[in-house]
């Protein structure tokens, strides 16, 4: 390569110009320059793309966690993907902080010296709780025990969010899926601790190899055991003096009733019968935040009678009984028999459309809204040793059950957990079955008989709203005291 300087001898030299004269290797040099140019071009394009992403990410973030059916976004997949990177984790933390902070925006900050929140809950160590207001001090006060049990927390602290991201992430999804709203940030943190403890218990149970059922998180996740029992397990029963109480005018005799509906030559199949497979069960409903299990159990069994005897699907009003049953206590509990008595005295049930369910919202009894009434003539008490017979030939049975707070997170299988001390919940017995299962103690397959029970906690609870409880071939075994009170309504 030769290097030349060009200038005019008659002029003052102002600028030198460089001229490259290519020799034999000029082609390779040109290729090298072109490669450098391409690299620079790609780099510039990449930087431009990064800038474009930076200025548009806020807009994208707004729709990232939407729950719209139109955009088909899978929240679990997105969040799990984000958890794989540090930047993704930080993004989730920022969204959680935005969510938590929003609870304080509509409420004025408490002044210095406001009443301190001591959070008197299980798992909180009073000596570690320095009585720091969650509103006035949004730092520190976050600990997690070695067994992942949250003792106390501060959802405003980024370090806590990062250290407990999995649980906080699950809580965030729980809030979204169940549309949970809390009035204050203190309430939210209280619910987070309860949620964390419930989640821990669920995980510990599902690791067991000797249990026949599984648990799963659901809408009850932010309720303490005491709160769950007070809201959902408040059925009233006649107790041990049931047989000493005066006979109810609408109660029929079992032997007379079974003779009417059971064919003389019938042979009872004690292995399996499921009214869900024979058009005798209506859809699962949800009593929501109201202790109205007694109404759902009694109304559900009446719906089954209309389905079996009239061959038609009717959905009747539980809210009518909650509002108008003078012998029961609305959302604060009731008796199955009183529900049937008042059902008859009121002239029948309204349709669900005419008298819709509003849960725990206050309502005044208003029977004028009913366009048509659907009544029963009487009801019959089922003897302890006749459950399978009555179920097969009469239909689903309104029964009491001694449930415990372990029922709250039942997901599926054969429930073999703890039971309540006494009957406290009303459900519907809709069938029975048998399955061969492996017994680890004996090392062989054994026949396992069970009852199929319809609950009133929504179809997202249990096995589509149902739970399976152990019995025996004759149906005499009553797990969790099922059927201490058992009745079938009669249309004729």
UniProtKB/Swiss-Prot annotation:
Give the source species. Plasmodium falciparum (isolate 3D7)
What are the catalytic residues?
293, 425, 455
Q: Motif Bipartite vacuolar targeting signal 2, which positions?
A: 84-105
Alphabetized, the UniProt keywords read: Cytoplasmic vesicle, Disulfide bond, Glycoprotein, Hydrolase, Membrane, Protease, Signal-anchor, Thiol protease, Transmembrane, Transmembrane helix, Vacuole, Zymogen
GO biological-process terms attached to the record = hemoglobin catabolic process; proteolysis; proteolysis involved in protein catabolic process
Topology of the protein relative to the lipid bilayer: Single-pass type II membrane protein
Q: What name appears for this protein in its UniProt entry?
A: Falcipain-3
Keyword Transmembrane helix found: yes
């Amino acid at each position: 390569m030769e290097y030349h300087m060009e200038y005019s001898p008659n002029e003052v030299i102002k600028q030198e110009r460089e001229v490259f004269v290519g020799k034999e290797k000029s082609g390779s040099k040109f290729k090298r320059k072109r490669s450098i140019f391409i690299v620079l071009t790609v780099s510039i394009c990449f930087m431009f793309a990064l800038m474009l992403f930076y200025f548009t990410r806020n807009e994208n973030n707004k729709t990232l966690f939407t729950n719209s059916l139109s955009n088909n976004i899978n929240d679990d997949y997105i969040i799990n993907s984000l958890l794989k990177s540090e930047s993704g984790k930080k993004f989730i933390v920022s969204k959680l902080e935005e969510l938590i902070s929003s609870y304080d925006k509509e409420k004025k900050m408490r002044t210095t010296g406001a009443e301190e929140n001591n959070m008197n809950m299980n798992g909180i160590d009073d000596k570690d709780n320095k009585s720091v207001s969650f509103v006035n001090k949004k730092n520190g006060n976050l600990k997690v025990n070695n067994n992942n049990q949250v003792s106390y927390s501060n959802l405003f602290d980024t370090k806590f969010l990062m250290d407990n991201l999995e649980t906080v992430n699950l809580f965030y999804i729980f809030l979204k899926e169940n549309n949970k709203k809390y009035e204050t940030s203190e309430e939210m943190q209280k619910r987070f601790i309860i949620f964390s403890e419930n989640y821990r218990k669920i995980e510990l149970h599902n690791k067991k190899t000797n249990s026949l059922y599984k648990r799963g998180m659901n809408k009850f996740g932010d309720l303490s055991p005491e709160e769950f029992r007070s809201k959902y397990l408040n059925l009233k029963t006649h107790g041990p003096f049931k047989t000493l109480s005066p006979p109810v005018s609408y109660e029929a005799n079992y032997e007379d009733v079974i003779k009417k509906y059971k064919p003389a030559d019938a042979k009872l199949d004690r292995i399996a019968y499921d009214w869900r497979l024979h058009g005798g069960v209506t859809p699962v409903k949800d009593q929501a935040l109201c202790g109205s299990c007694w109404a759902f159990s009694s109304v559900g069994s009446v719906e089954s009678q209309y389905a079996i005897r009239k061959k038609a699907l009717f959905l009747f009003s539980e809210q009518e009984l909650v509002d108008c049953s003078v012998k029961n206590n609305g959302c604060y509990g009731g008796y199955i028999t009183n529900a049937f008595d008042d059902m008859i005295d009121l002239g029948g049930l309204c349709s669900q459309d005419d008298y819709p369910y509003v849960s725990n919202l206050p309502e005044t009894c208003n029977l004028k809204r009913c366009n048509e009434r659907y009544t029963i003539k009487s009801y019959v008490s089922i003897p302890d040793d006749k459950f399978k017979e009555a179920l097969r030939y009469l239909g689903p049975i309104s029964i009491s059950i001694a449930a415990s707070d372990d029922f709250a997170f039942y997901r599926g299988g054969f429930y073999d957990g703890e039971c309540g001390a006494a009957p406290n919940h009303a459900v519907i017995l809709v069938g029975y079955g048998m399955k061969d299962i492996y017994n680890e103690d004996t090392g062989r397959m054994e026949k396992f008989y069970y009852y199929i029970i319809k609950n009133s906690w929504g179809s997202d609870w249990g096995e589509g709203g149902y739970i399976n409880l152990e019995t025996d071939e004759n149906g005499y075994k009553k797990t969790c005291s099922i059927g201490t009170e058992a009745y079938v309504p009669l249309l004729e």
